[in-house]
Amino acid sequence: MAQDIVAFRTGQFSSIFLTLHSSSLSVIKRALSKKIKSSPSIFQHIAVILQFTPELEKVNLQALKSLCEEFNIHIIGVSDWTNHLQKELIMTSGLALLGKSGEFTEILPEPRCLPVKIIHQHVASKQVIYAKNSDLIIHGNVEPGAEVAADGNVHIYGKLLGRAMAGVNNNVGSIYTQYLDAEFIAVSSRFLYKDNLPHEYQHEAVRIFADKDKLRFHFLLEKET
C-alpha cells in the first residue's frame, strides 16, 4: 500500500500531529488540498505539531509553514527531530522545538540574566511574536489565534486566549498570565491543548512551568476560602 504524502493523527493530550512524506511543496500542496476536501469540517483553523521526517531536511520550513496557513493549518512546533542538523533547520525557520516523541531530558535551571522584549499592546489574532534569547512581556491580551513565544519566560499582563510557548528550544522558562484560557501552551517541550487544561486553573492568574515530563500550575494569587 502506498504511503500517504500527508497524514494527520492524534497524540497525547489530544494534540494533532502532521506527518509529511514528500520534499516537494507542490506535491504537498496537492495532497493537502485533497485531504482537506475529503473532510472540510475537520480542518478549519487547526493547530498542528509537525512531525519531523527525513524528507523535511530538503524542505524550506518557512515556506511550508506559509503553505499550511493557506489551508488554515497552523504549525505551532516541530517534534521528533533526531540530530543537530534537524534541530538547526527548525530553529532557523523560527518554529518551536517541541522535543522528541516520548523522550524528555531533565531540564536543570542555570543562573542567567536574559534581556527582555516588551510589547505595550494586545497581540491580535494571527499575529506571531517570538522573543529569541530573551524573556517576553506582554502588556495586554493575547487574543484567540495569536501566538507568543520566548526562549525564556513569557509574562502576560492581560488575558491569555491564544497560544503561548516559553522555554523554547529546550530552554528553561515559565508562562505567567493574569487570566488563563489558552488555545495551547508549551513550556520546555511539554505542552497542553485547551481541552486538557486543568479546570481549577482556567480563568485564573497562574504560573505554568515544566516539572520532569509534566506541566505544573501554580496560582499567582491566593484563593479566597
UniProtKB/Swiss-Prot annotation:
Gene Ontology terms: biological process: cell morphogenesis; division septum assembly; regulation of cell division; regulation of cell septum assembly
Keywords: Cell cycle, Cell division, Septation
Transmembrane segments: none
SUPFAM superfamilies: Cell-division inhibitor MinC, C-terminal domain
Lineage: superkingdom: Bacteria
InterPro entries assigned to the protein according to its UniProt record, in alphabetical order: CAP/MinC_C (IPR016098), MinC (IPR013033), MinC_C_sf (IPR036145), MinC_N (IPR007874), Septum_form_inhib_MinC_C (IPR005526)
PANTHER family xref list: SEPTUM SITE-DETERMINING PROTEIN MINC (PTHR34108:SF1)
Family named by the database record: Belongs to the MinC family.
Subunit and partners: Interacts with MinD and FtsZ.
Function recorded in the entry: Cell division inhibitor that blocks the formation of polar Z ring septums. Rapidly oscillates between the poles of the cell to destabilize FtsZ filaments that have formed before they mature into polar Z rings. Prevents FtsZ polymerization.
Protein name per its UniProtKB record: Probable septum site-determining protein MinC
Gene: minC
